[in-house]
Swiss-Prot record:
The protein's role, per its UniProt record: Is required not only for elongation of protein synthesis but also for the initiation of all mRNA translation through initiator tRNA(fMet) aminoacylation.
Domain tRNA-binding: 562-665
Keyword tags: Aminoacyl-tRNA synthetase, ATP-binding, Cytoplasm, Ligase, Nucleotide-binding, Protein biosynthesis, RNA-binding, tRNA-binding
Entry similarity comment: Belongs to the class-I aminoacyl-tRNA synthetase family. MetG type 2B subfamily.
Annotated GO MF terms: ATP binding; methionine-tRNA ligase activity; tRNA binding
Protein name per Swiss-Prot or TrEMBL: Methionine--tRNA ligase
Length: 665
């Protein structure tokens, strides 16, 4: 298996805000490839993670009144929860604040400094905090000038404002490696997918002459300090790019994964906006370290809206959580992979999203499965007849289309062309639906002399749907399993040597099939998605006049002296369990910072069926509530605060960095 080691990475995401479907696309796309390669017999290592250093993170933390570490800790929890929701099968989640990564970054910096690939100089230029990138005046999308014509600022290509920065900095000698990089590109034209982007890098960035790259900063502290000059922190691109190597154990005692997977096939997938850093800075950094370069760099386009890029101010941002909660996971995975052509941007519209669910998933695939299961139950008491080739005049055509679809699917998957891979699957689905119309099994069933033909039709239908279920497994795992379950077949374990004729004997379908994709009301669901998108738009604030505010209260007003009697503290959940004899109560053991753990009973069991998810959370409690006896044998020493809205209840938690026992007031 050593020759079939495969390493796939997402970019590490910058945790400065909530991730939308653009980031979800990249992560799902890598997940699809990882799952496909596993099913093709590869030993796969799939990496994703977060780029947690930098000035923007430091500023966000200061705005929130917490430490940068506490800020990124909280963001990491949210990102991991999103990847769990999207069923991402990553093998490791790296954070650039991980100790092992920071140590290697510092070591590499000093090594490059010692071999004169890094030198100390001074940088002056326009800098975008949001992009973590420097720009020349000619690179700015818009330039601001004063009345005398002097440049006073500008806008980066990303749309973010820039500021003038002048500071001492270390530089990476990119110029020294320019010729070697050009030679590598010429020898490996397949290095960047899609075709054309490699020439774009040569034409726009390399041929005009590579400038040495600033790789340290002194104006903020949230980063990896340079050991020999700690007033400098290592700037984003050395720190961030090295994650692909450090995650596998590069320059560490435990380096088995690096030896194994870096010497296998290495694929990086990134958005087109960060292609330059991955196609120029990263290869040169690896050349400096005398490390093999990756095999493929896949730079995909963006999901845009009818009115341009996603923007909260436009009210057109789409978050994956909303789509999954409303329509399930598989429609989202299918839509994103089907709708972004290689080398181009894709457009998201609510109309197209709902339409693809109804027409391609519910009609094409769902109805095919329902009709097949229903007919096998009706004509053969649920027993799928043995597969026999060529009984009807249409069997050969279906078999040929199936074999061609399988071959095309593999070709497009190897090229990471997901829209065409799925198109190959839907070609088979369409042909199978047509096969039903051509063979007319309801007519065959009326003539006992045509029983063999009817049996062949049923077995060919089941065999074709089985092939479809196998091919969609990397994209839509739940759907694949649901289809195979209704056919009475086992889950997919391999895509190698898949064939229509390779159908198991003695298989019984379920007694009654269920729709795998219920049809949606187009008008209602389109309106729902638009409403959710509009809800993501920041509210326009009107001028606030406190004298005009009318307070809306559920209870009578109290005096400040009354409220001041209540002591609210931060407490950490140490243990939680269901209370025997009650379907409402949970029993908590909490550390409220006063030296001894306390017990509180709370009637929230129905809102937290998996109560263990609360362990480790920091909650707010009323600490000086008089203890009371409950269920005859328990004493509850306080109250845990929660919020209720629309029948849903959520415990009020605080940032993990806040110490136990902290008083809230």
């Amino acid at each position: 298996m050593s020759e079939k080691n495969f390493y796939i990475t997402t970019p590490i995401y910058y945790p400065s805000g909530k991730l939308h479907i653009g980031s979800a696309y990249t992560t799902i796309a890598c997940d699809v490839l990882a799952r496909y390669k596993r099913l093709m017999g590869y030993d796969v290592f799939y990496l994703t993670g977060l780029d947690e250093h930098g000035q923007k993170i430091q500023q966000k933390a200061e705005e929130a009144g917490i430490t940068p570490q506490a800020y990124v800790d909280g963001m990491a929890v949210g990102v991991k929860e999103l990847w769990q929701l999207l069923d991402i099968s990553y093998d490791k989640f790296i954070r650039t604040t991980d100790d092992y990564h920071e140590k290697v970054v510092a070591q590499v910096f000093e090594r490059l400094l010692a071999q004169d690939d890094i030198y100390l100089g001074e940088y002056s230029g326009w800098y975008s905090v949001s992009d973590e990138e420097f720009f020349t005046e000619s690179q700015l999308a818009e330039v601001f000038r004063d009345e005398a014509g002097n440049v006073t600022g500008g806008i980066a290509p990303s749309g973010h404002e820039v500021e003038w920065v002048s500071e001492e900095s270390y530089f990476l000698r990119l110029s020294k490696y320019q010729d070697r990089l050009v030679e590598f590109f010429k020898a490996h034209p397949e290095f960047i997918t899609p075709d054309g982007r490699l020439n774009e890098m040569l034409r726009n960035f390399i041929e005009p002459g590579l400038e040495d790259l600033a790789v340290s900063r002194t104006t903020f502290t949230w980063g990896v300090p340079v050991p020999s000059n700690p007033k400098h922190v290592v700037y984003v691109w050395i720190d961030a790019l090295l994650n692909y190597a450090t995650a596998l154990g590069y320059a560490q005692d435990e380096h088995g994964n690096f030896d194994k997977f870096w010497n296998g096939t290495v694929f990086h997938m990134v958005g087109k906006d960060i292609l330059r850093f991955h196609s120029i800075y990263w290869p040169i950094l690896l050349m400096m370290l005398d490390v093999k370069l990756p095999d493929r760099l896949i730079a995909h386009g963006w999901f845009v809206m009818k009115d341009g890029k996603m923007s909260k101010s436009k009210g057109n941002v789409v978050y994956p959580e909303m789509l999954v909660e409303r329509y399930g996971l598989d429609p989202l995975r299918y839509y994103l992979m089907r709708n972004l052509p290689v080398g181009s941007d894709g457009t998201f519209t609510p109309e197209d999203y709902v339409g693809r669910i109804n027409y391609e998933l519910a009609n094409d695939l769902g109805n095919l499965l329902n009709r097949t299961v229903s007919m096998i139950n009706k004509y053969f008491d649920g027993q799928i007849p043995a597969y026999v080739e060529g009984v009807t005049e249409f069997d050969h055509v279906l078999a040929e289309v199936a074999e061609q679809s399988i071959a095309d699917f593999h070709t497009h998957m190897e090229a990471v062309d997901y829209p065409r891979a799925l198109e190959a699957v839907w070609t088979l689905i369409s042909r199978t639906n047509k096969y039903i119309d051509e063979t007319a099994p309801w007519v065959l069933a009326k003539d006992e002399a045509l029983r063999d033909q009817l049996a062949s039709v049923m077995s060919h239908l089941a065999a074709s749907i089985r092939v479809v279920a196998h091919l969609i497994e990397p994209f839509m795992m739940e759907t694949s399993r649901a289809v195979l379950t209704q056919l009475g077949l086992e889950e997919v374990s391999s895509l190698e040597n898949l064939s229509l004729a390779d159908f198991p004997a003695d298989v019984t379908v379920v007694a009654k099939g269920t729709p795998i994709f219920p049809r949606l009301n187009m008008e209602e669901e389109i309106a729902y998605i638009k409403e959710q998108m509009e809800g993501n738009k920041p509210a326009v604030e009107k001028e606030w006049n406190p004298d005009e505010v009318e307070l809306k209260l559920n209870k009578d007003e109290i005096k400040f002296e009354d409220f001041d009697k209540v002591e609210i503290r931060v407490a950490e959940v140490k243990e939680v369990s269901k209370v025997e004899g009650s379907d409402k109560l949970l029993q908590f053991r909490l550390d409220a910072g006063d030296g001894e753990d306390r017990q509180i009973l709370s009637g929230i069991a129905k809102y937290y069926p998996n109560e263990q998810e609360l362990v480790g959370k920091k909650v707010q409690i009323v600490a000086n509530l008089k203890p009371r006896k409950m269920m005859k044998k328990y004493v509850s020493q306080g109250m845990i605060l929660s919020a209720e809205h629309d029948g849903k209840l959520t415990l009020l938690t605080v940032d993990p960095a806040v110490p136990n026992g902290s008083v809230i007031g």
